[in-house]
């Protein structure tokens, strides 16, 4: 109904273009309605600088276990260590939210099962895994902005946890984007909204969904 009302012919989706376009949920929808669908992420995640890390006043070598939920925070952690000339001890343990994130550690360290644990991607699974290692001194690697649920829960459990921001979500380069070309822009997060409204005046924006 909304398509007929607005005479929609072109949509922008704020996501990376799927590797297999036919598997996109928009593919059949676009074909059935004779729509053009473009894909462009409006945000990106970048590691913090060494200066930003040091401002958080956390000593990596005072901790025994890293908690990771993304590849970007892993990259940032090891980049910070390299830049600060910190040698990560072989005794360091790692807890990851998924197996895919855990396997990414192989880029930097020898993968040993006794050192690396991973959850199934759910909050409760990750929490149980952390509690199982309750005597460790943790660094919780975060991407800003982040949901406070996990750091607050770990604090209530009185675990030795240092929440540290290793990455930030920032606006992508939108200089080549003309939002007036589109009838609808599909956004997926508050960060998408922020990036779009900071880059363009509201009167230049089409319908946002």
What are the roles of these predicted feature ranges?
Residues 2-209:
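Conserved beta-alpha
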């Amino acid at each position: 109904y909304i398509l007929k009302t607005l005479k929609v012919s072109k949509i922008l989706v704020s996501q990376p273009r799927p590797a297999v376009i036919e598997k996109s949920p928009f593919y059949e929808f676009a074909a059935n309605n004779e729509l053009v669908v473009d894909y462009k992420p409006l945000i990106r995640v970048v590691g913090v600088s060494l200066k930003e890390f040091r401002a958080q006043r956390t000593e990596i070598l005072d901790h025994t276990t890293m908690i990771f939920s993304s590849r970007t925070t892993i990259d940032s952690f090891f980049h910070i260590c390299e830049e600060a000339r910190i040698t990560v001890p072989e005794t360091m343990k790692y807890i990851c939210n998924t197996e895919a994130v855990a396997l990414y550690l192989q880029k930097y360290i020898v993968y040993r099962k006794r050192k690396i644990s991973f959850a199934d991607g759910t909050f409760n699974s990750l929490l149980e895994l952390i509690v199982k290692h309750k005597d460790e001194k943790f660094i919780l690697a975060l991407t800003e902005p982040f949901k406070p649920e996990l750091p607050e829960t770990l604090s209530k459990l009185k675990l030795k946890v240092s929440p540290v921001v290793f990455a930030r979500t920032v606006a992508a380069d939108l200089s080549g984007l003309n939002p007036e070309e589109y009838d609808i822009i599909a956004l997926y997060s508050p960060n998408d909204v922020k990036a779009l409204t900071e880059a363009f005046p509201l009167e230049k924006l089409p319908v946002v969904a």
